[in-house]
């Protein structure tokens, strides 16, 4: 009996280098994690473009932090540096920053984008706020 094979062997897909000089950095900073996504000037992933417009991304968990260490400003700094380095490989030089969320890594992530060599054009706070919408969760009792 011939040995079983597991289907066709896939070739690793080659990542093509995009040449984008201007982009957007979306920093989502929650109480538990910080996620930095760097996109092209048209913004984040759209429904019409399934591949999306994300050039690079990194989170505190992806960089190597676990548990409560993901919520620290240092973890946000490392995540922003990692995302910026990957974006610079695609030729990115200038970003407009959009910050969302109440987390502790907001300012640190912006500073580390600048320190990594990206020029920050503008900073906008796009944190969603409810206009008396859903009822908030009950108060914590510790």
Curated annotation (Swiss-Prot):
GO MF, one example: rRNA binding
A Pfam family per the record: Ribosomal_S11
Domain of life: Bacteria
Stretches for region Disordered: 1-21
Keywords assigned by UniProt, alphabetized: Ribonucleoprotein, Ribosomal protein, RNA-binding, rRNA-binding
Compositional bias of kind Basic residues: 7-17
Keyword Glycoprotein: no
Keyword Transmembrane helix in record: no
UniProt GO cellular component terms: ribonucleoprotein complex; ribosome
GO biological process, one term: translation
Similarity field: Belongs to the universal ribosomal protein uS11 family.
Function recorded in the entry: Located on the platform of the 30S subunit, it bridges several disparate RNA helices of the 16S rRNA. Forms part of the Shine-Dalgarno cleft in the 70S ribosome.
Assembly description: Part of the 30S ribosomal subunit. Interacts with proteins S7 and S18. Binds to IF-3.
Name of the protein in question: Small ribosomal subunit protein uS11
Species of origin: Paenarthrobacter aurescens (strain TC1)
Classification of source organism: Bacteria, Bacillati, Actinomycetota, Actinomycetes, Micrococcales
């Amino acid at each position: 009996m011939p040995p079983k094979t597991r289907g066709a062997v896939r070739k690793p897909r080659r990542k093509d280098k995009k040449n984008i000089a201007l982009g957007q950095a979306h920093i989502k900073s929650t109480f538990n994690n910080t996620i930095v996504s760097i996109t092209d000037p048209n913004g984040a992933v759209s429904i019409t473009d399934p591949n999306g417009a994300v050039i690079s991304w990194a989170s505190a968990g992806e960089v190597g932090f676990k548990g409560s260490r993901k919520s620290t400003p240092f973890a946000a700094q490392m995540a922003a540096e990692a995302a910026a380095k990957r974006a610079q490989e695609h030729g990115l030089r200038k970003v407009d920053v959009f910050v969302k969320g109440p987390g502790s890594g907001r300012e640190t992530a912006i500073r580390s984008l600048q320190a990594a060599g990206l020029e920050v054009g503008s900073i906008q706070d796009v944190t969603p706020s409810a206009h008396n919408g859903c009822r908030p969760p009950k108060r914590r009792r510790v």
